[in-house]
Regions:
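Membrane-interface helix caps and helix-loop-helix hairpins in membrane proteins
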Residues: 56-60, 88-90, 114-121, 149-152, ...
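Short, amphipathic, aromatic/basic-enriched membrane-interface segments that mark the entry/exit
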Residues: 1-10, 61-67, 179-190
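C-terminal membrane-associated helical module and adjoining short loops/tails
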Residues: 124-240
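"…together with the soluble PPM/PP2C metallo-phosphatase catalytic core" -> "…together
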Residues: 3-11, 18-27, 31, 36, ...
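Multi-pass membrane catalytic core of lipid/isoprenoid biosynthesis enzymes
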Residues: 8-12, 54-113
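Short hydrophobic alpha-helical membrane-embedded segments
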Residues: 9-16, 72-73, 186-198
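Topogenic membrane-insertion module of multi-pass membrane proteins
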Residues: 1-46, 200, 205, 210-211, ...
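Helix-coil boundary and interhelical linker segments in multi-pass alpha-helical membrane proteins
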Residues: 21-36, 76-97, 138-158, 206-213
Length: 240
């Protein structure tokens, strides 16, 4: 087998490495560093698929390895980050362990993705990287002391309720668009619109001199909201 065929799996392994290191730093209470590693893992997660397409290096092993890496980086890591933040905030009872549901439902979501032929172009349910990045950016903002809006509606309750909502979205049948661009303006219109939302959010955050983590938080909040709105409209028009 040519060396180039191993490039996607090597990048996937870097994704896994970032996830493992993120878990270690979370145990040490270094949540900001853990978030940086989550971002690095998400970059690797994008690049391994891109490399596989460019090099035509798809393999069954690569597909399974990608899911295993994603479970650590985007399932286990965000669960532990929220758990650690709750413990640091004085929540030491049952509620501190609610976030582990993200890891469990991420595993279910990844297993479903691997056997579901309907998700070759778009997703059914919230992608694990989107879930993880939403959680990670929230934790980072809290850890760096840049929370606003009354502690983001009381950070503690958000970090208990959000995992339950996200877990439901992970295994839902709600169609969610991917960011794979293809030929044809009709196919790419929604993706370009979403990129416009990201750009507008970035400009607003930078203009208001708000911490950069809010760009990520707003981006994935917008992604979830936009897909939910699309699903509601689809249900409404299907009944007519």
């Amino acid at each position: 087998m040519k060396i180039v065929k191993h490039i996607p799996n090597t990048i996937t392994s870097l994704n896994l490495l970032c996830g493992i290191l993120g878990v270690i730093f979370t145990f040490q209470g270094e949540l900001s560093i853990a978030f940086y590693l989550m971002i690095a893992a998400s970059v690797c997660d994008f690049l391994d698929g891109f490399a596989a397409r460019m090099l035509n290096a798809y393999s069954d092993m690569g597909k399974e390895l990608d899911s295993l890496a994603d479970l650590v980086s985007f399932g286990l890591l965000p669960s532990l980050m929220i758990h650690r933040r709750l413990i640091e905030g004085g929540v030491t009872d049952f509620w501190a362990y609610v976030p582990v549901i993200i890891c469990i439902f991420s595993a279910l979501r990844l297993a479903k993705f691997n056997v579901d032929d309907r998700q070759s172009e778009n997703f059914l349910g919230l992608p694990t990287p989107a879930c993880a990045m939403w959680c990670g950016s929230l934790i980072y903002a809290a850890d760096r002391g840049v929370m606003s809006v009354a502690g983001l509606l009381n950070e503690r309750y958000i970090m208990i309720i959000a995992p339950l909502v996200l877990a439901a979205l992970l295994i839902s049948e709600i169609p969610m668009f991917s960011m794979k661009f293809k030929k044809g303006s009709e196919y790419n219109r929604l993706r370009l619109c979403f990129l416009g939302v990201i750009a507008a959010s970035a400009i607003a955050v930078l203009a208001l001199k708000i911490n950069w983590s809010y760009i990520i938080l707003l981006t994935f909040t917008a992604y979830i909201a936009l897909n939910l709105i699309r699903a509601l409209f689809a249900i409404r028009f299907s009944r007519k």
